[in-house]
């Protein structure tokens, strides 16, 4: 698939560098559309025809983005101090793509660690850094074997898979796709829900990935794959061998305070009402927040901000935080 530059690199800007990349060949779609039975009234063919027409209407080009440079990753090290090894790996890939016309290629990664330590939050922050989209696929609640690869148009209720949707219906050729809790993928599904990953996690075969519904090759080689798990023992070895594996530890108490302070500043800066809130949180508020898993900190802060404003105050106090969260430790710290 082809790509060409859209935004030239210029010093002093933090906007991502973007170019356009084709994620499918229109001639393939036109050929498939022509072969459909013109007079068929079967819903599956109508749905398939609609997908082909939509593909041709939108065209094949999508944004392919990458960070302007390594310095713009510095903030993530402050926000995600327990993900240093993962960020170092991404940083190496950014260095390879910097000062070149090449797109950013990131080796698929598996983030191993207990629930609540910020694995999904990391994925969101990485997507934001890259300027691309993030698609979350929670495997623990998905039972369909065709989740990633789509189901044949011959089947009732057939539809494209999530990879096809992310690339064809989305705006980016290199979205972040998070396969959350991959170790909990259902083993009772009629088809292996992880089967498509054998080709999707390999750069060469991902260049011509075929969704079973559309049966048109799409270029999924630029997708940034992040998988998460609590335990790697339930993941097939061939999939593990296709990824860089990182064991993410719970943050230390000091790191947890830093995460809480970063979330406080980020939420405040992201809302107009933030100007009514003190720029810095109180120390005892940070101490309280630092006892929570990162995934709970944001919810607690939003409650705290709201309670402070209900009382017409600019300062968030410990009493403003949720009682349950403020009253007990919820995270195992690294000492």
Where are the regions that the model predicts?
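AAA+/P-loop NTPase substrate/partner-engagement loops
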Residues: 129-159, 166, 256
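Pre-Walker A (pre-P-loop) alpha-helix and adjacent loop at the N terminus of AAA/AAA+ ATPase modules
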Residues: 67-112
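Conserved C-terminal "switch" segment of AAA+ ATPases
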Residues: 62, 171, 232-238, 249-315
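C-terminal engagement/docking regions of AAA+ P-loop ATPases
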Residues: 311-335
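Walker A/P-loop
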Residues: 104-139, 168, 237
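Conserved catalytic/switch belt of AAA+ P-loop NTPases
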Residues: 179-218
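Conserved alpha-helical scaffold flanking the Walker A/P-loop in AAA+ ATPase domains
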Residues: 154-178, 210-217
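Interdomain "pre-motor" coupling segment immediately N-terminal to P-loop NTPase/helicase cores
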Residues: 17-71
